[in-house]
A protein has these predicted regions:
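Extended, polar beta-sheet/loop recognition surfaces of beta-rich domains
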Residues: 21, 120, 128, 180-209
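An aromatic-rich alpha-helical recognition segment common to small helix-rich domains
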Residues: 79, 138, 149, 163-177
Length: 209
């Protein structure tokens, strides 16, 4: 079923006509703004819909090309009912993530999403437009004629070495990145959902990440 058709079904059930990005149904009971500012619940839902249904956003973020959400989450009320039960909901600096529990996931839904600190979320963000022709973490040093591996840690670039092939450089990056992910996971262990922690501890960096 297409998102638009699903939205019309939800509209019919709720009796509301307020569509967000042409599909989202604002069936929230109460005001969505207080003192001229959107409530946190509305902003969170709207931001999720933007990533799923805004063509302008997808042009800027190609990795979201095929991303969508479950039929249930077209309803603001259903969305908030689900995410409010997730550990980390409403915590300042935490973000809704769709990729950690299911790597490569394209669906925002109750079973595929979780909340994580921005440090964790940014750690796993794909940046295809910044990668270039080589694997993630790899750059060619034209002066040395070798491939360099680099990893950003706490905003600073760590040099991992020079190698004869992009594959060797990537393996160095992969090893360092997976180790760093585990360090960050341990840092947040007591606050993360157990499933999220385990997903981070077993996370594998792929050459096309």
């Amino acid at each position: 079923m297409k998102a638009g058709d699903a939205a019309r079904e939800v509209v019919k059930m709720s009796g509301k006509r307020s569509l967000v990005y042409g599909v989202g149904v604002n069936d929230w009971v109460g005001n969505i703004s207080v003192g001229g500012k959107m409530i946190m619940e509305y902003y969170l839902w709207q931001d999720m819909l933007k990533r799923c249904f805004s063509e302008k956003y997808k042009q800027k973020k190609p990795t979201y090309k095929d991303v969508t959400c479950s039929k249930e989450w077209l309803s603001m009320t259903s969305f908030i009912e689900d995410v409010s039960q997730m550990k980390g909901y409403g915590v300042k600096g935490w973000q809704l993530d769709k990729d950690i529990l299911v790597k490569g996931n394209k669906l925002y839904s109750k079973d595929t999403c979780c909340f994580v600190p921005s440090e964790v979320n940014n750690l796993l963000t794909k940046r295809d437009n910044a990668r270039g022709e080589y694997p993630v973490g790899v750059h060619f040093d034209k002066y040395a004629g070798k491939f360099m591996a680099k990893l950003k840690i706490n905003g600073k670039t760590k040099f991992l070495g020079r190698f004869n092939s992009p594959e060797e450089a990537f393996f160095a990056y992969k090893t360092a990145k997976e180790a760093y992910i585990k360090v960050v996971a341990q840092k947040w262990k007591d606050l993360l959902d157990e499933w999220v922690f385990q997903a981070l501890m077993s996370y594998e960096v792929a050459i096309d990440d």
